[in-house]
Each structure stands twice: as C-alpha cells, then as structure tokens.
C-alpha cells in the first residue's frame, strides 16, 4: 500500500520519467509474517508509450551528432524517435591476429568511448541505441562466417553492447568481398547470415542484463527469406532472434518467418535525398499493421559534410505525428553539433 499518491492516475504521469513509489507489505492472513527486511519496497513506475507505429532513425555519425534525436518530442511528451541506429561500425579481418573483429572508425569510437555523455542521454529519454555493423571491403562479411566464426563474432558484439551500454546490433550486408579461407569463414549465404543473427542475439541475452535487439536492414544476403537456424536438431525461426527489420530507401519491409508486420518498417525515408511521407500515407501504414517507420540521414545541424535538412525533416515528422498520433511535434529548441572527426559536442546550442 502507498499513501503518497492516492489519487495519481497513469494518465497523470509524465513520459520518460521514472517514479518511485514506496510500498509497505502488510500481512492480511493470520499466521503469515512479513520479515522486517522485506516489509518496505521501493516500486519503480514509468508510463508506457502509446504509439502503434514507432520511429527508428539511422544517424550518419560521420556527419551528425546523434544527440539531436532528443530534441524531437511529441506534444504529449513522448520522444518522437523510439530507436537510434549508429551508422556504422564494420566487420573486418585482422590478418596479423587472424581473426574477425568489429572495427570502429574515429567517429564511432568517439561515441562509444564517450557513451555516458553522447549516448546514455538518449537511453534515459527512452530511446534505444543500436550499433549497425556492415562490411568494409575485405573477406569478412555478415553472411560469410562459419558457425564457429558467427559464435565468436556474436560474442564480441554482445560484449560491446555490455561495455558501452547499447541496446542491440543492426546488420547491413554491404561492401564485403567475401570468400575468405580458414576456420572463421564459410561461403556467403543467407543461412550464415541467419546464424550470425542467432549467435548475436543469444550472446546478448546471456551477457546484457537489459533487453537487447537484433535489427536488420534488408540488403545483400539479409532478406525476409532468411532461413531458420537448427541447433542440436531444434529449429529456431528467425522471429526468435530478429526483433525488427527495415527495407532499403523507399521500400516496405516484409517480415521474416514467424514475425508479424509489427516488426517491420512500412517505409524507409532518406531525408537527405528529400524523401517525404504524407500524414495520410503514414496513417495507412499504421492501419495496415506496420510497427515502424525508418528514417535515414537526419541532420539538423549541418556541421558535417551534409547540409542541414532540419526544416524538411521536421515537416515529415509532423506529418507522421498528425497521421498516426493525432498530435504534432514540438518546435525543437536546440541543435547538437559534430565538431570534427572523432569529436562531438555534448552541449545543446539554441536554434537561431
């Protein structure tokens, strides 16, 4: 029981705020005794978002500071973005050490090394933060690792999520040469792409004490037709180890086996190319059952090599908010800048 907030309703609670409610356990049944150390409990409560369709944004981190996501808020206080994907880390082959590893360029590494000030503010607002992994012009690739190689690389990615407090991994099958030799490699196939997803999800669940996702960008061997993975004769459908998927620019993603449309992005909108969406189009996607809209290359600052696309992007965000949530997006007050290679400014700067 608690007498601190006797009339507080769930609708009174703010989004992205955690409330602590002190509770006292009182035994109502004769013969039942509550131990002193168990009598008082602090119960944490937060308001769950009401969106039927959510927003996932790929940030080109070579150009843009991902902290910009926190400035875009619905009128009811919910963040407009539900997940951010850091684009991107790479899967690479280290010839000297004879191993596959995750290579981070100076920008990705700076975000990871400064996670507390550059990434954790997003998570504290209820926005998931994922690291995307794609090929980098050598024999290592998302779809070309042996079963053993998938297990080893999956464990490395899970450790990265734990060390830097990330919410999962995205996979994007681009720019790999494939056809390496040795114990790390297998011929590229959708089967091996599925196995890497399986091993990564398994390792994250074992290592991270929070919910983690495997997210897919459909390209190359990564498609909706990914097969099941069989371990010791037990079938694991893709829906068991893949949480959400998106298509390439302008497309609608089809679900992997066992997944519904709620795990799929109904549109992939490249903001730097001027892609757009209407309020009626967004509502139609929601009514069809799609659970996500993907945004790519949002950059409200223009402090990298990409021009500021804030005005165009905000119009599209508001179209989605009006069509799907029957409200608008508040005017953003600040912008977060990228300073130079490997440097991001954690401080907000007022929009002129």
Region spans (language model):
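Secreted glycan hydrolases and related glycan-binding modules that recognize and/or cleave
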Residues: 11-352
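Generic N-terminal initiation segments characterized by hydrophobic and/or small/turn-forming residues
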Residues: 1-2, 20
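Short, small-residue-biased leader/transition segments that mark boundaries at the very start
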Residues: 3-10
């Amino acid at each position: 029981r608690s007498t601190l907030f006797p009339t507080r309703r769930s609708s009174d609670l703010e989004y992205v705020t955690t409330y602590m409610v002190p509770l006292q356990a009182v035994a109502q049944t004769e013969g039942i005794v509550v131990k002193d150390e168990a009598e008082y409990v602090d119960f944490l409560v937060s308001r769950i978002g009401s969106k039927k369709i959510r927003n996932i944004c790929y940030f080109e981190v070579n150009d843009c500071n991902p902290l910009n996501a926190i400035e875009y808020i619905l009128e009811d206080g919910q963040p407009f973005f539900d997940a951010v994907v850091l684009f991107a880390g790479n899967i690479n082959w280290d010839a000297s050490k004879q191993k596959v590893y995750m290579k981070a360029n100076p920008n990705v590494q700076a975000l990871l090394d400064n996670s507390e000030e550059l990434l954790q503010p997003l998570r504290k607002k209820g926005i998931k933060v994922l690291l995307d992994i794609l090929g980098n012009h050598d024999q290592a690739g998302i779809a070309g690792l042996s079963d053993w190689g998938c297990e080893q690389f999956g464990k490395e990615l899970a450790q990265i999520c734990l060390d830097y407090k990330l919410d999962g991994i995205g996979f994007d099958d681009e720019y790999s040469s494939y056809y390496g030799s040795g114990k790390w490699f297998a011929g590229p196939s959708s089967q091996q792409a599925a196995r890497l997803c399986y091993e990564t999800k398994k390792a994250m669940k074992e290592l991270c004490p929070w919910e983690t996702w495997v997210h897919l960008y459909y390209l190359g061997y990564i498609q909706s037709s990914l097969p099941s993975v069989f371990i010791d004769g037990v079938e694991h459908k893709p829906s068991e180890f893949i949480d959400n998927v998106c298509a390439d620019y302008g497309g609608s993603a089809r679900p992997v086996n066992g997944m519904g449309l709620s795990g799929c992005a109904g549109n992939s909108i490249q903001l730097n190319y001027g892609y757009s969406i209407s309020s009626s189009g967004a509502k139609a996607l929601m009514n069809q059952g799609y659970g996500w809209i993907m945004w790519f290359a949002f950059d409200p600052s223009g402090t990298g090599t990409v021009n500021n696309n804030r005005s165009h992007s905000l119009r599209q965000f508001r179209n989605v908010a009006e069509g799907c949530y029957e409200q608008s997006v508040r005017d953003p007050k600040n912008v977060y800048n990228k300073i130079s290679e490997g440097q991001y400014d954690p401080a907000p700067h007022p929009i002129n």
